[in-house]
């Protein structure tokens, strides 16, 4: 009964909470559109503002829980063409990106991908990003649409500094923004079987974190194995002229068109961060539980922007840590305060929270004071002026289903 009430709350409140997350007040006439806008409308999508774009929240009468479960059990496809796709090329491209991020890109194998973070001078996260290395002088990078202006201004500023430096003079780096390119995420346990019917490329060799140019029904497309759901899947980059055709190929039964609502519940079950909720410029990768993106060889000696602040948190411990929790009672949403149960001391706040369709429990992530982050710790979360019990639990909340061969 508790979960049924929570599911009802989810359906009623989720769309508005999603919009509040991004604090969008953009008028519809000002919203950008991906190359699939008309395709979405033709398929009954409910379009909503998100990160400056008009994006599908859901399709037809497919409910949030049903859409979520379809991806967990079968396969769904998401339009993520609002995200910013870029190429960095040049003799010193590896050095430039290792200056902007704490990742060890020099040791990354060609056509391998890694999650990373762009850091400000204090070690705060400007954005999280996926970086795919094609060669030492060529990288494909995906960043968040909601951070487009901030990211591109930062990248161009730092690119100018780099190319004007002694290192940059060894070989300037060029930035190419892939404007209007499509990006589709095919996700779910049946994703590989479905995509395999469209290509002669043996997808068994394309394991999680790898990328390749794959022939798909006559189109040679950049395909990276991974995603934002915790399931097996692929992110497929598509030139503007072919986006609609490829979307049609990737949306036949059993694939279900899937929107932002489902994408958010899937990523939270998988323990993945949403920028603007769980990450911001006042949060370091150590606080965010993303220490693993910092290359082992770079923790002590890496010369990256923000290194001093990051090393301070690595050495002394951060003031707070990102945690997952199971919440009793009503679901806890963003900004819900977290308290110590006995003293009543304020420990932190929830950054994302939903009723989990998979677990049939209310889950949340947030930040608490360092020392209160251990598994099994009991805390209280304030929901509508009432304090409810919550127990800290490891993330991801569900077991990932990535294909590792």
Where are these regions (language model features)?
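Conserved, structured C-terminal
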Residues: 2-10, 20-49, 55-59, 135-137, ...
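Acidic, proline/glycine-enriched N-terminal capping motif
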Residues: 2-4, 15-119, 124
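Acidic active-site catalytic centers that drive phospho-/nucleotidyl reactions
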Residues: 79, 128, 235
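Well-ordered mid-protein domain cores that form the structural environment of catalytic cofactors
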Residues: 103-158
């Amino acid at each position: 009964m508790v979960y049924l009430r929570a599911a009802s709350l989810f359906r009623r409140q989720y769309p508005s909470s999603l919009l509040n997350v991004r604090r969008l007040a953009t008028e519809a006439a000002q919203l950008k559109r991906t190359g699939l806008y008309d395709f979405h409308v033709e398929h009954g999508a409910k379009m909503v503002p998100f990160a400056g774009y008009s994006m599908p929240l859901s399709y037809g009468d497919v409910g949030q829980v049903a859409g979520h479960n379809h991806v967990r059990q079968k396969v769904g496809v998401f339009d993520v063409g609002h995200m910013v796709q870029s190429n960095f090329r040049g003799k010193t491209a590896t050095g430039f990106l290792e200056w902007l991020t704490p990742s060890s890109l020099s040791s990354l194998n060609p056509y391998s991908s890694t999650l990373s973070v762009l850091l400000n001078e204090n070690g705060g996260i400007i954005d999280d990003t996926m970086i795919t290395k094609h060669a030492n002088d060529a990288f494909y990078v995906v960043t968040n649409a909601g951070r487009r202006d901030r990211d591109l201004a930062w990248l161009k500023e730092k690119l100018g500094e780099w190319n004007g430096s002694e290192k940059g003079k060894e070989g300037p780096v060029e930035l190419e923004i892939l404007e209007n390119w499509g990006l589709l995420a095919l996700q779910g346990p049946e994703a590989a079987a479905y995509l395999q019917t469209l290509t002669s490329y043996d997808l068994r060799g394309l394991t999680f974190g790898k990328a390749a140019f794959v022939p798909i029904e006559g189109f040679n497309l950049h395909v990276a194995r991974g995603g934002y759901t915790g399931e097996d899947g692929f992110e497929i980059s598509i030139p503007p002229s072919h986006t609609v055709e490829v979307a049609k190929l990737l949306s036949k039964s059993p694939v279900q068109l899937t929107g932002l609502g489902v994408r958010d519940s899937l990523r939270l079950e998988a323990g993945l961060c949403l920028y603007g909720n769980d990450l911001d410029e006042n949060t370091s990768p150590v606080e965010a539980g993303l220490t693993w993106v910092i290359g082992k060889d770079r923790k002590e000696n890496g010369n990256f922007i923000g290194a001093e602040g990051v090393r301070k948190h690595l050495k002394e411990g951060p003031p707070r840590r990102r945690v997952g929790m199971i919440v009793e009672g009503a679901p806890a949403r963003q900004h819900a305060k977290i308290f110590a149960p006995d003293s009543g001391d304020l420990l932190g706040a929830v950054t994302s929270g939903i009723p989990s369709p998979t677990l049939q429990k209310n889950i949340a992530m947030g930040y608490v004071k360092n020392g209160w982050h251990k598994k099994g710790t009991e805390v209280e979360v304030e929901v509508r002026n009432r304090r409810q019990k919550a127990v800290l639990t490891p993330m991801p909340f569900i077991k990932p289903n990535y294909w590792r061969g």
